[in-house]
UniProtKB/Swiss-Prot annotation:
Location of this chain's protein in the cell: Cytoplasm
Residues making up the signal peptide according to the UniProt record: none
Naturally occurring in which organism (per UniProt): Neisseria gonorrhoeae (strain ATCC 700825 / FA 1090)
Function, as annotated: An accessory protein needed during the final step in the assembly of 30S ribosomal subunit, possibly for assembly of the head region. Essential for efficient processing of 16S rRNA. May be needed both before and after RbfA during the maturation of 16S rRNA. It has affinity for free ribosomal 30S subunits but not for 70S ribosomes.
GO cellular component: cytoplasm; ribosome
Keyword annotations of the record: Chaperone, Cytoplasm, Ribosome biogenesis, rRNA processing
Gene3D superfamilies named in the record: PRC-barrel domain, RimM
Protein family membership: Belongs to the RimM family.
Protein name: Ribosome maturation factor RimM
Gene (name only): rimM
Cross-referenced InterPro entries: PRC_barrel-like_sf (IPR011033), PRC_RimM (IPR056792), RimM (IPR011961), RimM_N (IPR002676), RimM_N_sf (IPR036976), Transl_B-barrel_sf (IPR009000)
Domain remark text: The PRC barrel domain binds ribosomal protein uS19.
GO biological process, alphabetically ordered: ribosomal small subunit biogenesis; rRNA processing
Assembly notes: Binds ribosomal protein uS19.
Pfam families: PRC_RimM (PF24986), RimM (PF01782)
Length: 169
């Protein structure tokens, strides 16, 4: 089993569908059906982890529905409601150069060109035009567009992002 520190939360089980063990999924991914690319899921809740194998999946009216092996009735499916879906980070597809998964950016330290620590990436958000880093630090929350105009380097080894961003912006 993969160490829990190497797993990324990808969504959660929000409910059941029908009587044959199908589940409704709230995916935290750009495309909800991309979760179907991973045959093995880890489900976590209240310190408990369950490993499951994906048997089938489909998108119905924009909603992801899945069926796990061994979950064959509504009661069994209902017992999984509220579990977080975790996928091992090493199962992700490789990224292109200068392309990053949000999960890899969260937690990175952001510094500006003057080596002033702006804080750590707490989250990202989509704006339609580009993604935006949400940085929490001693200077409060800072929002920096994740575009080459402001982001100079992303060093995944040292977990540091260098930004062309002043404290007075």
């Amino acid at each position: 089993m993969t160490d829990t520190q190497n797993r990324v939360a990808m969504g959660y089980i929000k409910g059941v569908f029908g009587i044959k063990g199908w589940l409704k999924i709230a995916a935290n991914t750009e495309y909800s059906d991309s979760l179907l690319d991973y045959p093995e899921w880890h489900l976590a809740k209240d310190g408990k982890t369950v490993s499951v194998t994906l048997e089938a999946g489909k998108v119905v009216n924009g909603e992801l529905q899945v069926k796990f092996e061994g979950i064959d009735d509504r009661d069994s499916a209902f017992s999984l409601r509220g579990y977080t879906i975790e996928i091992p980070r090493e199962a992700f597809a490789p990224t292109e150069e200068d392309e990053y998964y949000w999960a890899d950016l969260v937690g990175m330290t952001v510094v500006n060109k003057d080596d002033t620590v702006l804080g750590k990436v707490s989250n990202l958000m989509e704006t339609g035009a580009n993604d935006v880093l949400m940085i929490d630090g001693e200077h409060g929350q800072i929002l920096i567009p994740f575009v080459s105009q402001y982001i100079e380097t992303v060093d995944t080894g040292s977990k540091t992002i260098t930004a062309d961003w002043g404290l007075d912006y």
